[in-house]
């Protein structure tokens, strides 16, 4: 995001690190509301930057255009989470790997390709396909129908405890929580919790 932030010259109004400190909780909160169908994706895209700019005293005439430029920049970056290629290479030896996402439909396949990991993915299933979002069980059941899977033989690896882990658990799937942010949970229904993706290799 720094690339777009500096392209707009916003660092002159607010240091980038201060802006990110505002943006991250706003973005996470809005995504949680979207997961539970409380807001639309359009509202999320418009509001996450508008709200953050306002809190930081930043004047940006078109937050929605900023969001568009940010998303278009993301798909050009050849970045993946540490350990992702190694884990995916291991998983494909065990069976087909699919992606189940609440993300923006016009970006997901491009992100996989730019990161060089699309070759590991058999099928990309999006919430937009049936207008239902994780953690709603209907999306998980739909995903199994699409790939011919069963709950007993399917494992969800996800970094969002609410949308990924609770949703998959409710659908009867096995679950692995990638706790990349070291979130402290009062209860944890995941079969395995890791902070590094490569730790999953020894378990599967």
Describe each region flagged by the PLM.
Residues 26-30, 64-68, 86-88, 119-121, ...:
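A short alpha-helix capping/helix-coil boundary motif
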Residues 89, 100-204:
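Asp-based, Mg2+/Mn2+-dependent phosphohydrolase catalytic module
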């Amino acid at each position: 995001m720094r690339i777009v932030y500096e392209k707009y010259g916003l660092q002159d109004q607010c240091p980038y690190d201060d802006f990110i400190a505002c943006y991250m909780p706003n973005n996470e909160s809005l995504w949680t509301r979207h997961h539970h169908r409380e807001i639309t994706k359009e509202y999320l895209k418009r509001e996450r930057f508008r709200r953050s700019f306002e809190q930081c005293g930043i004047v940006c005439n078109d937050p929605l255009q900023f969001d568009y430029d940010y998303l278009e920049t993301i798909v050009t970056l050849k970045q993946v989470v540490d350990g992702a290629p190694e884990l995916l290479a291991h998983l494909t030896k065990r069976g087909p790997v699919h992606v189940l996402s609440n993300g923006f439909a016009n970006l997901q396949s491009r992100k996989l390709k730019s990161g060089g990991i699309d070759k590991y993915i058999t099928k990309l299933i999006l919430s937009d396909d049936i207008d239902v979002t994780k953690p709603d069980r209907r999306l998980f059941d739909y995903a199994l129908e699409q790939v011919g899977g069963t709950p007993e033989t399917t494992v969800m690896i996800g970094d969002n405890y609410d949308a990924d882990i609770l949703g998959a658990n409710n659908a009867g799937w096995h679950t692995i929580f990638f706790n990349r942010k070291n979130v402290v949970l009062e209860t944890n229904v995941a079969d395995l919790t890791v902070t590094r993706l490569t730790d999953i290799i020894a378990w599967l």
